[in-house]
């Protein structure tokens, strides 16, 4: 599983101001965005009632229109603190203990709330994409002049 958002153009590191603004917008709008309490209740916490108990991860993106979007990952697990420092934590199960949301800092929109389903928690490894493959010649080319065609030439061929 690779980690991207829709219409992603790139990534950026959110500043302290970006994080503070994302938190402010989430606090302001979480009750409305979470009005249906999907995968919450019973043994699962209702996320907007326990906001202070979650550890957070912030990942910044830019979309194709140039908007700055912060993806905020909420984790309520005292054993996940070390994982949170190393990489993006993605899980299955755990209901309201694990959820994430997106904040568009350019428009102030809070959207994309996803609360994990019920069941045992399973940490998902993040599959990293291989870098692009660069073709290289099998045999190193001897130093020489380059013809206008781009083909290396031997020094003996320098005179026509």
Predicted regions and their residues:
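C-terminal partner/receptor-binding element of secreted or periplasmic proteins
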Residues: 95-131
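Functional cores of ribonucleases/endoribonucleases
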Residues: 35-98
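Structured segments of extracytoplasmic/periplasmic soluble domains
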Residues: 25-36, 104
């Amino acid at each position: 599983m690779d980690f991207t958002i829709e219409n992603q153009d790139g990534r950026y590191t959110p500043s302290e101001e970006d994080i503070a603004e994302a938190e402010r917008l989430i606090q302001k709008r979480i009750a409305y965005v979470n009005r249906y309490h999907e995968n919450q209740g019973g043994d699962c916490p209702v996320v907007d009632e326990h906001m202070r108990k979650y550890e957070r991860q912030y990942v910044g993106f830019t979309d194709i229109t140039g908007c700055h979007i912060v993806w905020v990952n909420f984790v309520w697990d005292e054993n996940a603190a070390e994982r949170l420092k190393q990489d993006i934590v993605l899980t299955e199960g755990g209901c309201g203990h694990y959820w994430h949301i997106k904040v568009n800092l350019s428009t102030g929109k809070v959207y994309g709330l996803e609360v994990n389903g019920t069941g045992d928690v399973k940490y998902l490894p993040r599959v990293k994409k291989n870098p692009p493959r660069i073709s290289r010649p099998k045999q190193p080319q001897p130093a020489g002049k380059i013809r206008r065609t781009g083909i290396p030439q031997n020094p003996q061929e320098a005179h026509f």
